[in-house]
């Protein structure tokens, strides 16, 4: 959950990447941050990249990261954010600083090697 001590940690440490537990809390629960809390956390920590996590692994907490992107785009200029979000997928990876400018992870689409070897099918076209 959000903590006002994020601001202290942001002053005490140089943070490149911060992970924030993001989700839609059901009634009677408050352990995940909301979309605006994720942005507030990143701003308070003075990190360069914020990665929302856990938003897609619990069905009762499931959230949509596009909400963070929408709020980020709406507020980044006015609030002069010095960070940007990165949206991970389960099984994905993020390597800092190599991936520092990426916004989304996308699994490899495959088939980069198409037509590099003879086709091993009995017909020339695939419907």
Where are the regions that the model predicts?
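Binuclear metal-ion centers of metallo-dependent hydrolases, dominated by the metallo-beta-lactamase
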Residues: 8-12, 35-127
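Active-site-proximal loop/helix segments of hydrolase catalytic cores
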Residues: 1-45
């Amino acid at each position: 959950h959000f903590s006002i001590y994020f601001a202290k940690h942001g002053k005490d440490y140089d943070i490149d990447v911060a992970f924030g537990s993001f989700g839609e809390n059901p009634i009677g629960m408050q352990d995940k941050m909301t979309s605006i809390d994720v942005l507030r956390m990143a701003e308070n920590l003075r990190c360069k990249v914020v990665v929302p996590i856990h938003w897609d692994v619990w069905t009762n907490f499931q959230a949509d990261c596009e909400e963070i992107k929408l709020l980020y785009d709406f507020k980044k200029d006015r609030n002069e954010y010095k960070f940007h979000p990165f949206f991970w997928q389960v099984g994905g990876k993020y390597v800092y600083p190599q991936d520092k400018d990426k916004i989304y992870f996308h699994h490899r689409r495959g088939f980069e090697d198409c037509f590099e070897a003879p086709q091993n099918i009995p017909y020339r076209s695939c419907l």
